[in-house]
Amino acid sequence: AQYFIQDSSQVLAFVSVTFVWIAFTALGAACGGAGRIRAFDPLVGWAWLGVAFTTAGVLFSIPFSLMSVLAGVLASGAGVWVWRRDGGIVPSGFLRLLMLIIPLLALITAMRASQWDEFSHWIIIPRYMLETDAFPSGGNPYPNAGLAAYPFGWNFVTYLASRVAGVFLENAGALINVFLLLMFGLVVLRLIAQAIEKPELVQKSNWYFVSLGGAAVLLANPTFSQKIVLTSYAETSTAVATGAGVILGWLICCALA
């Protein structure tokens, strides 16, 4: 039990990461139409926020804290609009997948950083972002960071979750990694339903069908090493984003054929 239940900080981590995930989803959904693949909404929202933070921080030196507040307000408005338009923000299948992996979520929220690259880059960069409120520069060096010029897209996730929590969250990346895999599981279900010509399966999202999507992404190995899924490494998010791009490209080719 000590590996699953430790203290109240586990609840704080889960709630904060979930808030960021819903914000990503709301923003992504607001950018798409009724015919979109809803499972890709978080990726779209994350991408737009990454572009906004990078542009504002690099070109105009706008503090991250101010951008976070603006992003929160925008996401709240987008969430209300999407809810009224679609009747919800997060697909019901995703919520069922979360319920199926509650023990895994408890384990992840009890975890702390443990891998070498986390201490040299993946958690130290977001900590600098949280403490300095700006990108690294001549006047704001990140002295202990190994790769300060590395793209910041993935670091925004840990930063935003920590900003919501009010404390630095070492396990935010691991939680988002699992959320991303579950999201991709819904895409796998959509492809299966399309292949067997039963699109109604996606709409019904019964427990058996949903569990198949979860098994497809959690039991398989999405990266070169399964253990890094439960870390702040960027390999899992990169794999999911790449897979999403491949699927979208394939669907575009099918539509044009």
Predicted regions and their residues:
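Transmembrane alpha-helices of multi-pass, membrane-embedded glycan-processing enzymes
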Residues: 16-23, 44-48, 71-72, 154, ...
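Aromatic- and kink-enriched transmembrane "portal" helix at the membrane-lumen/periplasm boundary
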Residues: 6-9, 13, 57-58, 205-240
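Membrane-embedded, hydrophobic transmembrane alpha-helices
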Residues: 1-88
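Active-site lumenal/periplasmic loops and adjacent helix-entry segments of GT-C-fold
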Residues: 106-211, 226-232
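Membrane-interfacial loop-to-transmembrane alpha-helix junctions, especially the N-terminal start
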Residues: 31-46, 91-95, 201-213
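Specific aromatic-rich, kink-prone transmembrane helix
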Residues: 23-24, 28, 237-256
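Transmembrane signal-anchor helices characteristic of membrane glycosylation enzymes that use polyprenol
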Residues: 79, 93-117, 220-221
